[in-house]
Amino acid sequence: LTEAVQDPDDNSHFFVGSTGQGLYEFKNGLFAKLHTWNNSGLSSILNDTEFNRNNYVRVSALQYDREGNLWMANNETDTIIKVMQPDGSWFGLYYNELKGLPTFKQIMFDKNNRIWINSSRYIPGLACIDLNGTLKNNSDDKIRFSGPKFKNQDDNIEEIDDIYRYDFDQDGSIWLATNKGIFVLRDPDNFINNPNPVFERIKISRNDGSGLADYLFSGVVTTYIFIDQGNRKWIGTLDDGVFLMSEDGTETLEHFTTSNSPLPSNNILTITDDGRN
């Protein structure tokens, strides 16, 4: 299983993606339906045998939009982006720029209703799609994919192996947790039209009189980022627990590990809050 998403209009109704069987639907705590290659808009990667058709329907990156449409990634198929509408009907959006990308981990919508997607595995990167106000007509859409090489503010080119997670902060910037630490896209509005977007590295002064600084979490596998209502950055790592960083990312406010907190492991897979603060 990849992830679950709750129906925003019905907290007893939710969907769960899978790595091969399609999309599971649950209602009132009970299994309701399996959406797969023969009863939905989803496709299988392999179609040579019945077994392969039933076990290679890969679904991830579940996300509802403002109109109640459920978006998802039907990974490793030609038309990766699939949408199930509130009435149960389906459609897909094909983009040549996304063809062949192996796995999408997230689909999120920004304040301007643009779609942001992070690609993982052997072609990691960040994609943005502007639907131009026409949901099912992608002929007028604008799209950009950037990766796996990112240019930072020092004009250094860094090649990443994975984007584990991203999140929007209250200033509109996008913070990305990668296998090489944290990157920040400061100007998402111009990402689609910019042939050379800059992915900023937060610099942490060494404070040793040298005037030198190091990139935030340089060389550290950062597995998750969650930005709270105070605009603070919660950053999960592969083997060093959770760091709570200041709004600008330059100051460590807390560092939680198995030795000083109830964390059962220092390998952090997800971070969220209870919505009460």
Protein language model regions, located:
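Surface-exposed loop and turn segments in beta-propeller and other repeat-based domains
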Residues: 1, 30-55, 91-100, 134-159, ...
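Signature of short aromatic-glycine-proline-rich micro-motifs recurring in repeat-based ectodomains
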Residues: 1-4, 20, 47-63, 101-106, ...
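Long, internal scaffold/assembly segments composed of regular secondary structure
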Residues: 3-5, 14-15, 68, 74, ...
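Residue-level detector of Asp-centered blade-edge/turn motifs that repeat once per structural unit
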Residues: 6-11, 64-67, 109-113, 168-171, ...
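Conserved beta-propeller blade signature
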Residues: 12-17, 24, 69-73, 114-118, ...
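Short loop/turn segments immediately following the C-termini of beta-strands
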Residues: 18-20, 28, 60, 67, ...
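Short loop/turn segments that connect beta-strands within beta-propeller blades
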Residues: 27-30, 84-88, 130-134, 187-190, ...
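Long, C-terminal catalytic modules of enzymes
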Residues: 230-231, 235-237, 244-247
